[in-house]
Amino acid sequence: MSILVVTGTSTDVGKTVVTAALAAAAREAGLSVAVCKPAQTGVAPGGPGDLAEVTRLSGVTAVVELARYPEPLAPDTAARRSGLPMLRCADVVETVRALDDGHDLVLVEGAGGLLVRLGAEGFTLVDLARALDAPAVVVAAAGLGTLNHTELTIRALSAAGLACAGTVIGSWPDEPGLAERCNLDDLPAVTGVDVVGSVPAGSGRLASASFGAAASTWFDSTWLKSTLTRL
């Protein structure tokens, strides 16, 4: 049983699709998978959030969302403005550990970037990962700016004593330009962490069967096998 945190260099870099791809690849390998999204923002009560997309794409139905706020803001800001209770780190830890007891793999998808405040006492995904003793996968953009953003994120993980399991490009264009091609080579050099996967742009629009059949091919096969066989 193992826990893997999925964070990103910013918002809208493809965390949800990468989470779904990891879940689908693990399912294909015969593992039982659960996914936790501690805080969902920008979605009204009853509306489909990120976990609905994870389920649609990967087929994983063991999904847990702990808090939801209607405004598209950082979770602690959204909680204050809505008057709804703030998420507590201890509650998230308890939930994830309970999921871990019954599944081979638990994926925990963050909100926004690594240091976004998630709830009470300003806790972040760093605090959560440390409490869970879990490594993180960093989802990064492909284009200009990603070298700086990704290195900052990985340095923050390292400074907190947390392991980075790899970098995944969340949306790799059909026709990558010069910047994208150079970034693919330069990211490992500047961060010290391998790029272990690239999800093709538009993959989130695939039907479930097509997504599930392709998901494992988007990751480095040696990395994926090593990651899943350690569970």
UniProtKB/Swiss-Prot annotation:
It is found in: Cytoplasm. The keyword tRNA-binding does not apply. The active site is at K37. It catalyses: (7R,8S)-7,8-diammoniononanoate + CO2 + ATP = (4R,5S)-dethiobiotin + ADP + phosphate + 3 H(+). Its EC number is 6.3.3.3. Signal peptide: none annotated. Catalyzes a mechanistically unusual reaction, the ATP-dependent insertion of CO2 between the N7 and N8 nitrogen atoms of 7,8-diaminopelargonic acid (DAPA, also called 7,8-diammoniononanoate) to form a ureido ring. This is ATP-dependent dethiobiotin synthetase BioD. It comes from Rhodococcus jostii (strain RHA1). The lineage of its organism: Bacteria, Bacillati, Actinomycetota, Actinomycetes, Mycobacteriales.
